[in-house]
Amino acid sequence: MTNICIVGAGGRMGRTLIEAIQQAEGLDLTVATERAGSSLIGADAGELAGVGRLGVAISEDPAAQVAAFDVLIDFTRPEGTLAHLEICRKAGRAMVIGTTGFTEAQKQTIREAAKEIPVVFAPNMSVGVNLCLKLLDLAARVLGDEVDIEVIEAHHRHKVDAPSGTALRMGEVVAEALGRDLAQCAVYGREGHTGERERKTIGFETIRAGDIVGEHTVMFAGIGERVEITHKASSRMTFAKGAVRAAAWLKGRSAGLYDMQDVLDLR
């Protein structure tokens, strides 16, 4: 049995993760936390997630309960995630990171910690999205520099980072396949008199509206035809199930930085 800690347990993703753990075999929710001062402290995690009483009370500090879990799953905010990462590093616990919006310096902190503990770090835990990453690599290599490439993503009104981590990862995969540096070729949004499109750029467009769970399309547009690879998520459960699968996969792994391509054996 793999014991799991969910941080941010009272949020939309946290509750879905609790539900996903209850549906999975070989996993047990033993710790669930919320930010200090939250009105949810003391509530039963199962009742909060709508899966019935589990006997796991929402608490404040995962550091005080490291002996009770093997893997910590985090879909919170970058600053909080790094604090939880340090807790896991000191205690020798594995971690699944689904948080997005990290700076390059923060990503380096994750890479350094992964030299000591096993970490799955992926902007999207969905099996479908990770299959799309493989398809994008293939499409980019086949279509090459003959097409214009655009990444369009849409999420709910509450998402705070843009473009999404998934959109950026899709752009990275395409850029790497074409031998480009995304930092040098990315164009984020367009406004005013932009002039003719520069060849070999990768464009990003962002939509924030309503309750859209997550939609991503990468367009390879040539003359006379275009190819579009699209993923649409209709429920957060697809991300939660992927994260839970990653947590189960991590148990017993050696220290290292992994992603969902590793978990799904898509390398």
Curated annotation (Swiss-Prot):
Top-tier EC class: oxidoreductase
One biological process term in Gene Ontology: diaminopimelate biosynthetic process
EC number: 1.17.1.8
Binding site for NADP(+): 35
Catalytic activity: (S)-2,3,4,5-tetrahydrodipicolinate + NAD(+) + H2O = (2S,4S)-4-hydroxy-2,3,4,5-tetrahydrodipicolinate + NADH + H(+); (S)-2,3,4,5-tetrahydrodipicolinate + NADP(+) + H2O = (2S,4S)-4-hydroxy-2,3,4,5-tetrahydrodipicolinate + NADPH + H(+)
Positions with a binding annotation for NAD(+): 8-13, 34, 98-100, 122-125
Coiled coil ranges: none
Domain of life: Bacteria
PROSITE patterns in the record: DAPB
Keyword Mitochondrion: no
Protein name: 4-hydroxy-tetrahydrodipicolinate reductase
Origin species: Thioalkalivibrio sulfidiphilus (strain HL-EbGR7)
